[in-house]
């Protein structure tokens, strides 16, 4: 099975990490944990409220603390926030304690998927498309750096993406458990 203690989903907002992650967790018998939701639960405020009251830097501190605590456990499917890879310590921990799946999505697909979403503080601006392009330019190399497996989700439903990942993960894990 999974050669790492946990399965970790990374990728930009709108890629499907939470939706697909829940499905994969159920399929593989893992406990699903959304890092953003864990932050909300621990802090007792919404993500927009945390950004407004404490700023992005404090949010990133909460994120790093919660991610570290989750990665110290086993048998979790951890859906990270899109910016979790910005912290080098997070990247190191993710790679050390997780098999990492990178879900990629294009900016046009993100704009469609996130059109009505008001819980993304970094997108509460008129220039959403430019912000997403800038984030992609900065974060995509970091997602690729930590990824053990990648999947383009633009034209896949959550069910299709899950089915593809189940097959690819099973094949990948079989290969990694085969004696050399």
From Swiss-Prot:
Residues at which Mg(2+) binds: 18
UniProt record, GO biological process: amino acid biosynthetic process; aromatic amino acid family biosynthetic process; chorismate biosynthetic process
Keyword Cell membrane on entry: no
Keyword Cytoplasm included in the entry's annotation: yes
Record field: transmembrane: none
Keyword terms of this UniProt record: Amino-acid biosynthesis, Aromatic amino acid biosynthesis, ATP-binding, Cytoplasm, Kinase, Magnesium, Metal-binding, Nucleotide-binding, Transferase
Residues where ATP binds: 14-19, 120
Listed SUPFAM superfamilies: P-loop containing nucleoside triphosphate hydrolases
Positions that bind substrate: 36, 60, 82, 139
Co-factor(s): Mg(2+)
PROSITE patterns: SHIKIMATE_KINASE
Assembly and interaction partners: Monomer.
Protein's name according to its UniProt entry: Shikimate kinase
Organism of this sequence: Xanthomonas euvesicatoria pv. vesicatoria (strain 85-10) (Xanthomonas campestris pv. vesicatoria)
């Amino acid at each position: 099975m999974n050669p790492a203690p946990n399965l970790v989903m990374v990728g930009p907002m709108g890629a499907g990490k939470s939706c697909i992650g829940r499905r994969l967790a159920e399929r593989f018998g893992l406990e699903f944990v959304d890092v953003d939701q864990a932050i909300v639960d621990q802090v007792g405020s919404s993500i927009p409220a945390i950004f407004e009251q404490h700023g992005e830097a404090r949010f990133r501190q909460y994120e790093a603390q919660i991610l570290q605590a989750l990665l110290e456990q086993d048998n979790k499917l951890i859906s990270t926030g899109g910016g979790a890879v910005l912290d080098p310590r997070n990247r190191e921990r993710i790679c050390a304690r997780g098999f990492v799946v990178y879900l990629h999505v294009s900016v046009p697909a993100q704009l469609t998927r996130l059109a009505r979403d008001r819980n993304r503080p970094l997108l509460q601006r008129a220039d959403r498309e430019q912000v997403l392009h800038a984030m992609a330019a900065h974060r995509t190399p970091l997602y690729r750096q930590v990824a053990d497996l990648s999947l383009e989700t633009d034209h896949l439903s959550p069910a299709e993406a899950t089915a593809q990942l189940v097959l690819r993960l099973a094949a990948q894990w079989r290969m990694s458990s085969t004696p050399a």
